[in-house]
Design a protein with these regions (language model features):
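Glycan-recognition patch characteristic of GH18 chitinases/ENGases
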Residues: 1-98, 115, 125, 136
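Compositionally biased, intrinsically disordered low-complexity regions
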Residues: 11, 72-73, 107, 198, ...
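Surface-exposed acidic, glycine-flexible loop patches that form ligand/cofactor-binding
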Residues: 19-23, 56-59, 99-100, 143-148, ...
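Structural recognition of alpha->loop->beta junctions
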Residues: 22-28, 32, 86-110, 168-186
């Protein structure tokens, strides 16, 4: 596998024991889902699920195991991002989990800045505070990296359509993260009136659900993964 070619997969914590050594060897990045925000801090509710991390590392020592925070219907992001203290609390608690369980970084899956999906809080200011939240998290990860002697990555999972692009300053965000994981499985679904393909090579120029829309807003293809 080329050093620049990355294959990532998400697994819910309760299913970590189903990830085989063969699976682990096929991946460069494994995202463990999900930590959540409670009272402004990032928590992982069932840490016993993480016992399999050492087994997967033994199977593939080069595998990056990344803690994913959020997911569909997970709130607390808008509130945490709104103030300096909130952003600091988010970043420090996230990195504390990285330190405690030996993760290789943090994945922020905020669904979605500026858009109230599944009833979670949102605000117009999320566009700017999303960048500030990532900046604080990046700084905290860098401090921890200096202490532990290894690079700790920061990635984000982003929506596949125009509303996410308009709700985030992607030209600024991309400079803070190692990877942008585009949720292309949301490009088509039962919420639309037209059928179509996920992650297809070519889209209609008027289609709001397309990778080229993200590229046009400043997201570098070298950081984008579908």
């Amino acid at each position: 596998m080329s050093a620049s070619y990355r294959v990532g997969g998400y697994v819910v914590g309760r299913a970590l024991d189903t990830v085989s050594p063969s699976d682990a060897k096929k991946l460069t990045d494994l995202f463990v889902a999900f930590a959540v925000i409670e009272d402004g801090e990032v928590v992982y509710r069932k840490p016993d699920e993480l016992a399999d991390l050492s087994r997967l590392r033994a199977a593939n020592p080069d595998l990056r195991i990344i803690l994913s925070i959020g997911g569909w219907g997970a709130g607390g992001f808008s509130e945490a991002a709104a103030t300096p203290d909130g952003r600091r609390g988010f970043a420090k608690s996230a990195v504390a989990l990285v330190r405690r369980y030996g993760f290789d970084g943090v994945d922020v899956d905020w669904e979605y800045p500026c858009y109230s999906a599944a009833g979670i809080a949102a605000a117009p200011s999320d566009r700017e505070t999303f960048t500030l939240l990532l900046s604080e998290t990046r700084s905290e990860l860098d401090r921890e990296s200096a202490a532990c002697g290894r690079h700790l990555c920061l990635t984000i999972a982003v929506g596949a359509d125009q509303y996410f692009i308009e709700g985030a300053c992607m030209d600024e965000v991309q400079d803070l993260v190692d990877l942008v994981n585009v949720m292309t499985y949301d490009m088509r679904g039962g919420f639309q009136v037209l059928t179509g393909h996920h992650t297809c090579l070519h889209h209609s120029s008027g289609d709001l659900y397309r990778i080229s829309a993200a590229a046009a807003r400043g997201t570098e293809s070298s950081r984008t993964r579908t």
